[in-house]
Amino acid sequence: MEISWIGVLLAFVAGMVVAMAWYLKGAIADAWEGLTGITPEKNKPVRTRNLILLAVSNAATTVGLAFAVGLTSAATGNDSVWMAVVVGVVAWLTLSASTLLQHNSFEQKPLKLTTINTGYQLALFLAITLVLGLF
């Protein structure tokens, strides 16, 4: 099994770009703020901590997906970009989306918030595995 650590680094950067694009400004960010009540002003005191947590969690996700893609590639003999993306979709569906849906349902969070956050996770997993698949 081979892992391109340059690919991992670039996939991590892609994941951070997705996070910033999803939650920083625009219609999705505005809807998320409205549903959570978390405004840029409320976020300011914990912004650095949250960015560190985002980077650590995205790094863990990227490395985990790199190993999943590498193992799947080694097991199947298929190292295509599409195989990597399929690994990302399967990982998202079985680990991320299902878990977030459970938590948000029991916490009685709005379906729109679940959709926004689950959509972000899908975009994140797709971006990461697309880049990994290219390397």
Task: Annotate each language-model stretch with its function.
Residues 1-135:
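Juxtamembrane/disordered regions of integral membrane proteins
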